[in-house]
Amino acid sequence: TQSKLANLLFTYELQRRLAPRGKTIAVAAHPGTSSTELARNVPTVLQRAFQVVSPLIAQSPAGGALPSLRAATDPGVLGGQYYGPDGIGQQKGAPVVVASSDQSYDIGLQRRLWAVSEELTGVTFAV
């Protein structure tokens, strides 16, 4: 989705700006698919379908938190890395470094999003 792409673009641009300054790094993570209550307001028929399919493709909410926890706490994490589950389609599994979309690596888009973010918020990010 656009919001996920924007998150990655901003993270990569932030890391590019932080790199010359030293130890602070910017990383990103995604949970894969987690069995949560997000489907509680969908029609009952769909809820039943989710209950059948979910164990096959999703992990627990605790499992979904692991990529973020690793990105935030593992001393081996490097700036600009992106963490997600190692399973098929990055849906579930152990947290590992994963690739993001080709578009997320577009430096021009990263810089443009940074500039638009500053413009729309009226804040110049001191990085």
Where are these regions (language model features)?
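NAD(P)H-dependent oxidoreductase Rossmann-fold/reductase module
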Residues: T1-V127
